[in-house]
């Protein structure tokens, strides 16, 4: 059965390892977690953020001095969920190396830039996109006004962090995130979102 067929059936590949004590089976993600590799694939939401945060904390407890590799292929999603990942990345002792494979958009791009300086990478054909946070509110006018003010505060917070992570001016970040701003891997490197475009392992 091909990998695509396996994925369509909702199955996760299993890796069998042999040792002097016999055989042991791992799902592929658990096996990669042993190598300190974690993934964010798909939308950023409470569930995916909870899994990433738990893995970050687990790997810190395993070895607080060894880097963690964080692979990202995400269209973005919830700001609050994404910020829980961002804050945990800054909180833990190990440095987190980020790598974009495919797409890092919105909160995905924010987390890509949140990796340790000098250790933020992208594969050559990936796309990166930044924009301002989206929001929608219903209800009474006063409630809508409260939500609008909160979105503006969130935008200022995200822009300030992006300016710090990229080295761009706050004014440029504000202008560029006014609408969807797409970049190639090379453009993202020039912008300061990543440090290097890599096509092969060193």
UniProtKB/Swiss-Prot annotation:
Share an example GO biological-process annotation for this protein: protein quality control for misfolded or incompletely synthesized proteins
- What is the designated name of this protein? ATP-dependent Clp protease proteolytic subunit
Pfam families linked to this entry: CLP_protease
Q: What is its EC number?
A: 3.4.21.92
Name the species this protein comes from: Leptothrix cholodnii (strain ATCC 51168 / LMG 8142 / SP-6) (Leptothrix discophora (strain SP-6))
The role this protein plays is: Cleaves peptides in various proteins in a process that requires ATP hydrolysis. Has a chymotrypsin-like activity. Plays a major role in the degradation of misfolded proteins.
A single Gene Ontology CC annotation of this entry is: endopeptidase Clp complex
**Complex and partners:** Fourteen ClpP subunits assemble into 2 heptameric rings which stack back to back to give a disk-like structure with a central cavity, resembling the structure of eukaryotic proteasomes.
Q: Does the keyword Protease apply?
A: yes
Q: Which GO terms describe its molecular function?
A: ATP-dependent peptidase activity; ATPase binding; serine-type endopeptidase activity
Family to which the UniProt record says this protein belongs: Belongs to the peptidase S14 family.
Per UniProt, subcellular location reads as:
Cytoplasm
EC class name: hydrolase
Catalyses which reaction(s): Hydrolysis of proteins to small peptides in the presence of ATP and magnesium. alpha-casein is the usual test substrate. In the absence of ATP, only oligopeptides shorter than five residues are hydrolyzed (such as succinyl-Leu-Tyr-|-NHMec, and Leu-Tyr-Leu-|-Tyr-Trp, in which cleavage of the -Tyr-|-Leu- and -Tyr-|-Trp bonds also occurs)
The active site annotation covers: 106, 131
Question: Keywords for this entry?
Answer: Cytoplasm, Hydrolase, Protease, Serine protease
Query: Gene name, please?
Result: clpP
The organism's place on the tree of life at top rank:
Bacteria
Entry keyword Flavoprotein = no
